[in-house]
């Protein structure tokens, strides 16, 4: 595989994940800030690797595989850490919704790829809005700077959960015909 910067950025994001988890558990006052900073850097590299891959025409199958995996592992890690820290039903429910959606849509994309119809379920604007709300919510809940930030982050978490459900419904509707045509009971 030929080296390219977008792939390097994606691999860098994967490498950040254990440091992200370690930073969360550091027994120092600045741990929430450091954790959020790592999460923010991962988010920037996620945007940048896709932008550069398209701009420089360096998209690869490996990048197309690894990029969403890195994203999902980082988001799931953040959700698990936040649920553990908050230890409340009100955070756990949207986290379960988001993690479930990621698993379902990943499986759906794999299924559609098997059928040769992967392009039918490309990322939608609903998915992009969901991701934006989700990242802002997770960043706020990781940082925990003050009560106002936490309240705003929880509101964004619920907005993200609603968009999560909505975007999943949209993806399933697009794939419904292909799914029904290929179900064998």
From Swiss-Prot:
Q: Could you tell me the keywords of this UniProt record?
A: Cell membrane, Lipid biosynthesis, Lipid metabolism, Membrane, Phospholipid biosynthesis, Phospholipid metabolism, Transferase, Transmembrane, Transmembrane helix
Q: Which Gene3D superfamilies match?
A: 1.20.120.1760
* Main subcellular location: membrane
An MF annotation (GO) of this entry: CDP-diacylglycerol-glycerol-3-phosphate 3-phosphatidyltransferase activity
State the superkingdom. Bacteria
Question: What is its pathway?
Answer: Phospholipid metabolism; phosphatidylglycerol biosynthesis; phosphatidylglycerol from CDP-diacylglycerol: step 1/2
So where does this one cross the membrane?
Answer: 7-26, 33-52, 89-108, 151-172
| Enzyme class, first EC level, given as a word | transferase
Q: What EC designation does it have?
A: 2.7.8.5
Cysteine disulfide links: none
User: What's any GO biological process attached to this entry?
Assistant: glycerophospholipid biosynthetic process
Q: Name one Pfam family in it.
A: CDP-OH_P_transf
Q: Which family does it belong to?
A: Belongs to the CDP-alcohol phosphatidyltransferase class-I family.
Q: What is this protein called?
A: CDP-diacylglycerol--glycerol-3-phosphate 3-phosphatidyltransferase
- What species is this protein from? Haemophilus influenzae (strain ATCC 51907 / DSM 11121 / KW20 / Rd)
Q: What is the lineage of its organism?
A: Bacteria, Pseudomonadati, Pseudomonadota, Gammaproteobacteria, Pasteurellales
């Amino acid at each position: 595989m030929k080296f390219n910067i977008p792939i390097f950025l994606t691999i860098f994001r994967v490498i950040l994940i254990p440091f992200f988890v370690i930073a969360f558990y550091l027994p120092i006052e600045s741990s929430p800030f450091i954790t959020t900073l790592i999460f923010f850097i991962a988010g920037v590299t996620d945007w940048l690797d896709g932008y550069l891959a398209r701009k420089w025409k360096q998209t690869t199958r490996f990048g197309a595989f690894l990029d969403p995996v890195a994203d999902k592992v980082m988001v799931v890690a953040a959700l698990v850490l936040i649920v553990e820290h908050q230890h409340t039903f009100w955070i756990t429910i949207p986290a379960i919704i988001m993690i479930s959606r990621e698993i379902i849509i990943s499986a759906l994309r794999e299924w559609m790829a098997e059928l040769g119809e992967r392009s039918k379920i490309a990322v939608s604007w609903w998915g992009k809005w969901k991701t934006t709300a989700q990242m802002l919510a997770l960043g706020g809940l990781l940082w925990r700077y003050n009560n106002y930030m936490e309240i705003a982050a929880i509101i964004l978490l619920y907005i993200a959960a609603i968009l999560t459900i909505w975007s999943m419904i949209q993806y399933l509707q697009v794939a419904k015909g292909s799914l029904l045509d290929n179900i064998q009971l």
